[in-house]
Swiss-Prot record:
Notes on activation and inhibition: Strongly inhibited by ADP.
UniProt gene name: nagK
InterPro entries: ATPase_NBD, N-acetyl-D-glucosamine_kinase, ROK, ROK_cs
Listed HAMAP family: GlcNAc_kinase
Reactions catalysed, as given in the entry: N-acetyl-D-glucosamine + ATP = N-acetyl-D-glucosamine 6-phosphate + ADP + H(+)
Function per UniProt: Catalyzes the phosphorylation of N-acetyl-D-glucosamine (GlcNAc) derived from cell-wall degradation, yielding GlcNAc-6-P. Has also low level glucokinase activity in vitro.
Pathway named in the protein's UniProt entry: Cell wall biogenesis; peptidoglycan recycling
Protein name: N-acetyl-D-glucosamine kinase
Residue positions binding ATP: 4-11, 133-140
PANTHER family in alphabetical order: N-ACETYL-D-GLUCOSAMINE KINASE, ROK (REPRESSOR, ORF, KINASE) FAMILY
This protein's UniProt keywords: ATP-binding, Carbohydrate metabolism, Kinase, Metal-binding, Nucleotide-binding, Transferase, Zinc
Source organism: Escherichia coli (strain K12)
GO biological process, one term: peptidoglycan turnover
Amino acid sequence: MYYGFDIGGTKIALGVFDSGRQLQWEKRVPTPRDSYDAFLDAVCELVAEADQRFGCKGSVGIGIPGMPETEDGTLYAANVPAASGKPLRADLSARLDRDVRLDNDANCFALSEAWDDEFTQYPLVMGLILGTGVGGGLIFNGKPITGKSYITGEFGHMRLPVDALTMMGLDFPLRRCGCGQHGCIENYLSGRGFAWLYQHYYHQPLQAPEIIALYDQGDEQARAHVERYLDLLAVCLGNILTIVDPDLVVIGGGLSNFPAITTQLADRLPRHLLPVARVPRIERARHGDAGGMRGAAFLHLTD
């Protein structure tokens, strides 16, 4: 059996998958915030419960935000303070007496989608998350591309391209990002960015679901806003596609539930690509909340 953990700031979620990559059992517990020992105990207790339930010693893969393993072997994960700065992989491998594999949670999302039965035909899969932030991952021939610093796929921290500023106006504000830079596309293309753009142009503080509801009702202002957002997304994604040239782009995160994102994006891309470039297939993520656990479990299938 393959155990996949999706660990975030508030929850530790475990999914157990069989050899057919089907979910057999899952359980969630709160993430301890202050005690590293309590954090390790929470993970180990879930593994012990799964081992007992299924009568085997399952493999363990973990998806977690941040850098799973820095040069000194420690985890960097600001959203998981109890474990950040600790040698998490080594400690869990020792306590569980098995090889524990860690990767960035966005890479696990992309891996889950790349291993979907419908998508395994595509050699190069790009996962794009449009949620609280903007991120993603790259999967080549069924294996995640992590890079030296585990930051492959940190698309949200690319800066707005010149074409975007031309389209939005040269006086468009370059917002300061949590990473310390200015103009990162995450500040405009995430769910919060979607809402910020609306407030910037229309001076109304609405959340993304409220704007989308207005769009569905035919509200002209909301429709104009969505058109602007999609144009901005196409400009930014065009730059990424010129570098990566994937066969498939799978979009996840809260905004992926808005059909216009996946149905109206492809037609906007050619003007931002080289004339010989082919627009990749663009699809909504198939596995929802289980995607992180699923991809983490499959880290042991990538050898």
